[in-house]
Amino acid sequence: DASRYIIEDDYDSEFRYKGKPIPALQGFDAGGKVIYLGTFSRSIAPSIRISYMVLPDQLMGVYRDKGQIFSSTVSRVDQLIISRFLSEGHYERHLNRMRAIYKSRHDVLLAHLQSLEGVCRISGENAGVHLLIHFQNGMTELRAVELAKREGIKVYGLSGCAIGPLRQVETGTVILGYATLGEEKIAQAAERLCRVW
């Protein structure tokens, strides 16, 4: 149907640790059918809360006409600072520094989860700032979350992100994020999780 659009939410795509970066679908869109969404919450600072949208040319008029009724909750000063940060080339340098920091945290976490081999399978480790832990020992998501909580560690069950019911193979899956922790805390937390899981 020619009147339909694809919405591409390119969250965390800046952080890829293995292989070449995966190009955005929007970059291949010769027909103007992809609406591209992104955010600076991981790459710059969560507190800024600035997102962006790249619209196909044919939707720009509609946005100008109807999008005016939405007011931005982001201060004009923050928007101008980000604009200048981007236009002066600081963002790319900052992103390279953040990639190195997150890659180092990522590597520390994976190294300290080695003892879980056979207990679980890890996925999502090639990009982003979190991993999925798929338990193969019969542990449920609820049990894994509870055991982590007892250790003072917050992990999330995959079911909290699902639109519908999870398939049976996904019911023992948790999300383990590492963006906000330093390497030492990551190592300590991973060792404690390995003991209880």
Report the location of each language-model feature.
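Conserved glycine-rich beta-strand-loop-beta hairpin in the small C-terminal domain of fold type I
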Residues: 83, 100-110, 120-134, 144-147
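Conserved core segment of the aminotransferase class I/II
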Residues: 30, 34-100
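A generic "structured core" feature
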Residues: 2-7, 65, 82, 109-113, ...
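Residue-level detector of anion-binding/catalytic polar loops
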Residues: 5, 153-154
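Active-site pre-lysine segment of PLP-dependent enzymes
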Residues: 1-3, 12-43, 57-58
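Conserved PLP-binding active-site segment of the aspartate aminotransferase-like
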Residues: 55, 132-138, 155-191, 195-196
